[in-house]
Structures are given as C-alpha cells and as structure tokens.
C-alpha cells in the first residue's frame, strides 16, 4: 500500500481524543477525514447527526452489523457503537487519510481486517485526572462514571500489550499531546501532500 495509512485513535472516554482530533482536522482538514461512527445512544447537547455520530436505532444497527456492513462494533453502557465500511470508504473517496476513533474492542476487531492503520492510544496522566474531566462534563451518573473509570483502568492496562499500539500518548498537556500526534503522523501527512493535496 503506497498511499497514506488510516489512523486508529483509541483511549478512554475523557482522555482527550476528540479534542486532539478536532485540532488535527482544523489544521489539516484537506489531508485527514474523520470516519463518523454509528451509535444507538442519544445525542449529547451540541452533537449533530452525521457530524459527531450517526444516531440510529438498535434495530437498524443490529441489522447492518448482521449484514456485514461494519468494520468493528462494540457495546458500552447499553449502547452500540461501530464503524461502517461505508463511512471509511466515504473518507477514502475524498483522497483523505481516514481517522477512526474506536474503543479497545474495536482495535482488536480492526486488527483482523486488511486495513493496516497506525494504532495510537491516548491516555490521561492518571485516573484521578480522568475522573475530574468526566465530572466536568456533567453527562455522567455516579453509576455510569464508575463504569467508565473501570473501563478506563482496564484499557490503560491492556494498552501495554506488546504490538497492540504503535504509539501511546499521555495527554497531560494538550499542546504536547498534539505535537506528539502530529509527529507520529508526519510521514503520512507528507505522503498525502505528495499526492497533490495541500
């Protein structure tokens, strides 16, 4: 594969993946394209269908998963999340590097495909900092917060598995984390720019 490789971003909720991704798309919008995931959860305030997620019913999503339309899917807190093949193809059709934001289960599923992306794990400096960030969102109940923190602890342990990720970024400072992300993707950015994009 001579063109730029897709990028898989993973990490616990509240680690800063979305913020890093927004910065990357603001600076390099003509090079990167975000693969919009599907979910059965309700939209949060300010989220747009087709931009942040495709918000669908469980019935629709289960039907499409059964039909083999998804690269990866997972269930978390009673909601389904997943990346459709069509969403990735839509980004690639624009000659952009496809960025996928998936959980650890999704990473393991993608490892079984022929996608060959760069795998990057974004983690908070500590679980205490993560808890603080999640509480500031005001979107979690105590029960869902406890679930997210337990999942984060497990993800941060699993991320150490040899060969699972190409890079682990500790997001203790947004600027430093963003610099590390850009540095890791510099080769792919050059490849994409070499195909006549700016």
Curated annotation (Swiss-Prot):
This is Guanylate kinase. Belongs to the guanylate kinase family. Substrate binds at residues 37-51. It holds the Pfam family Guanylate_kin. PROSITE patterns: GUANYLATE_KINASE_1, GUANYLATE_KINASE_2. Catalyzes the phosphorylation of GMP to GDP. Essential enzyme for recycling GMP and indirectly, cyclic GMP (cGMP). Involved in the cGMP metabolism in photoreceptors. Its EC number is 2.7.4.8. Monomer. Interacts with RD3. It comes from Bos taurus (Bovine).
